[in-house]
């Protein structure tokens, strides 16, 4: 039975198999640290009177989360969040989901990046008014380099990405995916057009969705923000401890001879 939903189903342990030469597929979420702020009490006593409606309570819970109903993460494990941004139009819907990079543990106890993260684009055709058939969705994975192409795209520029999931294998050429991003004729935004030709299951489909200038700006802003996380640089930055760096440098004064400015 077809899934007629306004939003896609998001599996926690998704493992899509759409590998290509220009994109890497991994799974996982992002760990988020929470920071609190302490307010210092004052010596003055001030009486405050306020009126708060039930509607305000509702929106506050929707915005910040209701701690009484939200599940708590397992003890000792960081909270994991799975997010996505969706754009709905008359004939199709587009959802963009970030996928975290992968690391491997070294014998020294450190971790090394093994696979870059990526952005998973899911296109679903319309199945009625404000309904989309996500069982017939087509997916396209954007590598970090392809993301860089998009964020540097000018208002009148276009780009095209080609993927062959079976490149280098016996079924090479039987599945072709082409994503085109081109400006709208009136300059009001861009359109995303995903064409999929799959000779293995006799599929030849094209899904088109227009993106307004404002919607495109939101996507580009999100892409710029998440890009350092997709290449794992946030993990390196979070691991830097000034006291340890100072101790290593003092113990080895000649350390850093390979740096260009020390030559």
From Swiss-Prot:
Protein name per UniProt: Single-stranded DNA-binding protein WHY1, chloroplastic
Sample GO molecular function, one term: DNA binding
A GO CC annotation given for this chain: chromosome, telomeric region
Biological process (GO), any one: regulation of telomere maintenance
Outcome reported for the amino acid change (mutating residue 148 to E): In atwhy1.2; reduces binding activity to single-stranded DNA
Alphabetical list of InterPro entries matching this protein: ssDNA-bd_transcriptional_reg (IPR009044), Whirly (IPR013742)
Gene: WHY1
Induction of expression: By salicylic acid (SA) and infection by H.parasitica.
